[in-house]
């Protein structure tokens, strides 16, 4: 997860209560895919293809229980609160290296902002039938491979897991135990998630992955089908042949609240990065880009301001007005302003935040 994406939005919070671990819904067949999602102004609080928002929030409670609910300490004066304030100060000063230079700060950021992001991202992913099929491992009888660039803080990871979990048929493990030989008992396909980030989020990723596997997937074969790998690298510097291999064989790439920062810091390198996607991604790979809606997501070229989505479209798709040409990618869906609003009844000890953004979903030609 690259670094300027860390700014916040706003909603409400409540105190810690009972932690429900699991949803009553567990099969994707209960929730048929809408193959023609409409352009909407606001995403639903809970898409039935994901675990409920409270269960997503609860995963962070369980993972970081000691940090969020310290014994014999006032939450307002806890070490976590102090670290959150330090991260806020570093972000305000645009000192992104300092904001994420140790595990304490990275965990503080994850506790403060990732629950809102994970809940929002889950609704975003579930909005697209193409992405649901990938995350549920329902494409071409093969494993699904997902790359989350700038995904170290866990929002994408937990959102993907909230959909993957509901797609698992947990009756298969009982069939195996009873030696039942039927169609239900065949080997499940794997969801392979690669997270790449310029900061070292390995501790956060390991903690969240362990909780996902123990509390949502219950270990055994279902947990073995959910594979997570973290790479500590700057995506703009991944130019060597061994680095470029990461783009081959992918079904989905996500760039969530990352592109604006890339272009703000290094325009030329960012253009080359997107061009590497043009050259190395296989046909059929999907690319999802989310970014803040409004003037924040503008870049300046030759003293002129352009919406960042205009530049991205041009690099990936080409001149959209020229119907006679085909670019490296085709635009599947777009929206220049859409909201995800948190349910104010959600139980979390830190304020949760709404999200207004634009999105682009592309597919590789």
Curated annotation (Swiss-Prot):
<dbReference type="GO" id="GO:0070042">
    <property type="term" value="F:rRNA (uridine-N3-)-methyltransferase activity"/>
</dbReference>
<dbReference type="GO" id="GO:0008757">
    <property type="term" value="F:S-adenosylmethionine-dependent methyltransferase activity"/>
</dbReference>
<comment type="similarity">
    <text>Belongs to the class I-like SAM-binding methyltransferase superfamily.</text>
</comment>
<dbReference type="Pfam" id="PF11312">
    <property type="entry name" value="Methyltransf_34"/>
</dbReference>
<keyword id="KW-0963">Cytoplasm</keyword>
<keyword id="KW-0539">Nucleus</keyword>
<dbReference type="GO" id="GO:0005634">
    <property type="term" value="C:nucleus"/>
</dbReference>
<keyword id="KW-0949">S-adenosyl-L-methionine</keyword>
<keyword id="KW-0489">Methyltransferase</keyword>
<dbReference type="InterPro" id="IPR021463">
    <property type="entry name" value="Methyltransf_34"/>
</dbReference>
<keyword id="KW-0698">rRNA processing</keyword>
<keyword id="KW-0808">Transferase</keyword>
<dbReference type="GO" id="GO:0005737">
    <property type="term" value="C:cytoplasm"/>
</dbReference>
<comment type="function">
    <text>S-adenosyl-L-methionine-dependent methyltransferase that specifically methylates the N(3) position of uridine 2843 (m3U2843) in 25S rRNA.</text>
</comment>
<dbReference type="GO" id="GO:0070475">
    <property type="term" value="P:rRNA base methylation"/>
</dbReference>
<protein>
    <recommendedName>
        <fullName>25S rRNA (uridine(2843)-N(3))-methyltransferase</fullName>
        <ecNumber>2.1.1.312</ecNumber>
    </recommendedName>
</protein>
């Amino acid at each position: 997860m690259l670094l300027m994406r860390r700014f916040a939005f706003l909603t409400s919070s409540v105190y810690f209560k009972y932690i429900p671990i699991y949803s009553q819904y567990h099969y994707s067949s209960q929730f048929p895919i809408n193959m023609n999602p409409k352009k909407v102004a606001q995403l639903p609080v809970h898409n039935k293809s994901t675990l409920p928002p409270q269960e997503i929030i609860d995963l962070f409670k369980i993972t970081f229980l000691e940090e969020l609910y310290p014994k014999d300490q006032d939450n307002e004066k806890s070490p976590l609160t102090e670290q959150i304030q330090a991260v806020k100060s570093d972000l305000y000063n645009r000192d992104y290296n300092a904001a994420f230079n140790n595990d304490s700060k990275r965990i503080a950021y994850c506790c403060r902002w990732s629950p809102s992001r994970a809940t929002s991202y889950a609704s975003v992913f579930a909005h697209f039938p193409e992405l649901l099929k990938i995350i549920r491992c329902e494409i071409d009888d093969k494993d699904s491979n997902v790359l989350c660039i700038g995904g170290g803080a866990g929002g994408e990871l937990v959102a993907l897991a909230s959909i993957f979990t509901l797609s698992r048929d947990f009756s298969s493990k009982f069939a195996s135990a009873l030696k039942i030989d039927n169609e239900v008992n065949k080997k499940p396909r794997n969801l392979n998630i690669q997270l790449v980030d310029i900061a070292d989020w390995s501790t956060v990723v390991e903690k969240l992955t362990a909780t996902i596997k123990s509390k949502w997937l219950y270990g055994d074969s279902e947990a073995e089908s959910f594979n997570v790998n973290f790479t500590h690298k700057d995506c703009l510097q991944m130019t060597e042949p061994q680095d470029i291999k990461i783009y081959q064989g992918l079904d989905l790439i996500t760039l969530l609240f990352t592109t604006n920062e890339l272009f703000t810091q290094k325009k030329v390198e960012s253009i080359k990065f997107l061009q590497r996607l043009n050259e190395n991604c296989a046909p059929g790979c999907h690319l999802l880009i989310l970014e803040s809606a409004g003037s924040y997501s503008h870049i300046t070229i030759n003293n002129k301001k352009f919406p960042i989505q205009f530049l991205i479209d041009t690099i990936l798709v080409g001149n959209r007005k020229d119907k006679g040409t085909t670019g490296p990618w085709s635009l599947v869906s777009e929206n220049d302003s859409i909201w995800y609003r948190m349910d104010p009844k959600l139980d979390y000890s830190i304020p949760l935040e709404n999200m207004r953004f634009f999105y682009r979903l592309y597919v590789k030609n």
